[in-house]
Amino acid sequence: MVKGQSLQDPFLNALRRERVPVSIYLVNGIKLQGQIESFDQFVILLKNTVSQMVYKHAISTVVPSRPVSHHSNNPGGSNNYHGSNTTAQQQSQEADDAE
């Protein structure tokens, strides 16, 4: 496994497994919403009313609608919690205001 994916894969897998609604912000500022249906090394399959294949290199931020826990590969198997943070919420609000 590539070292950079040791956090990414468990996080995306928890979002997929728990069917957590997510907002995905692209590097060009576009906001996509849906549930992660599947993913691999290069793409995320995002499902809403339709399925969209989103290339990871185009993604800036993935924001879950609620906190998600996943087990990391850290010694001792400690839990890591990820949820919406203030910066992501501000970005979301600014994007909504701009529309």
From Swiss-Prot:
Keywords: RNA-binding, Stress response. Residues 9-68 form the Sm domain. The keyword RNA-binding applies. GO terms for molecular function: RNA binding. HAMAP family: Hfq. Homohexamer. Belongs to the Hfq family. RNA chaperone that binds small regulatory RNA (sRNAs) and mRNAs to facilitate mRNA translational regulation in response to envelope stress, environmental stress and changes in metabolite concentrations. Also binds with high specificity to tRNAs. Involved in the regulation of the bacteriocin carotovoricin. This is RNA-binding protein Hfq.
